[in-house]
A protein has these predicted regions:
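A hydrophobic, multi-pass inner-membrane permease signature
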Residues: 1-207
Length: 207
């Protein structure tokens, strides 16, 4: 209970403060339930900025990037797990090593590439940069390793194509991994602050 309150406490205070006047927010002792519920703060947020536009842009990016990551990461994880090709494990390790590179180290080169390609101030810049994830491939690969190779071989003997095995057998058996990646990716894109600040300039595109 103590841990749960510690986690929920700040969120509850934030909701409570949203209904208070500025002078009431930091009063001591904390009044969790406001004396009077003021809706002015919500009215100001809704009308002082283009909140509906920002909200829809954020939702659009979060949904598109999440769907793309699920597709690209699951395909890559399937290849790294069930397909046999030269240098498979080495390529996976090299791809995984990209997680060790801080985003701040590639921020400027990334921006220069985006500008050179003419993608600056477009949602496509954010979508393309986040459509692939080494972390997502790692999660799904670990999940797919638990699927017996005999199941994959049996499907091949029955005449199922490689993509058919991926779509009809592998994906249904990795629902738990896909669910985890969905939540993590959506949450990460929804909370992304730096990306839109760097690559978007028009108010109608901001999140």
């Amino acid at each position: 209970c103590i841990v749960a309150f510690t986690m929920i406490g700040p969120f509850a205070w934030m909701v409570s403060a949203s209904f208070k006047l500025n002078t009431e927010i930091f009063e001591y002792p904390i009044r969790w339930i406001p004396k009077v519920f003021h809706m002015d703060n919500y009215d100001k947020v809704w009308h002082s900025i283009a909140f509906p536009t920002y909200f829809m842009n954020t939702l659009k990016l979060a949904v598109i990037i999440t769907v793309l990551q699920l597709f690209t990461c699951s395909l890559a994880a399937y290849a790294f797990t069930k397909l046999k090709f030269s240098g498979r494990d080495l390529i996976f390790l090299a791809y995984l090593a990209t997680m060790m590179v801080p985003w701040h180290a590639i921020m400027i080169p990334q921006f220069l590439v985006v500008r050179t390609l003419g993608l600056y101030n477009t949602h496509a810049s954010l979508i393309l940069m986040q459509a692939f994830s080494a972390f997502g491939v790692f999660i799904l690969r670990q999940n797919m390793l638990s699927i017996p190779d005999s199941l994959h071989e049996a499907a091949k003997i029955d005449g199922c194509s490689t993509f058919g095995i991926y779509a009809k057998i592998i994906l249904p058996l990795t629902r738990s991994g896909l669910a985890i990646l969905t939540v993590l990716t959506f949450n990460n894109v929804w909370n992304d602050y730096m990306g839109p600040m760097i690559y978007l300039d028009s108010d109608n595109l901001k999140t």
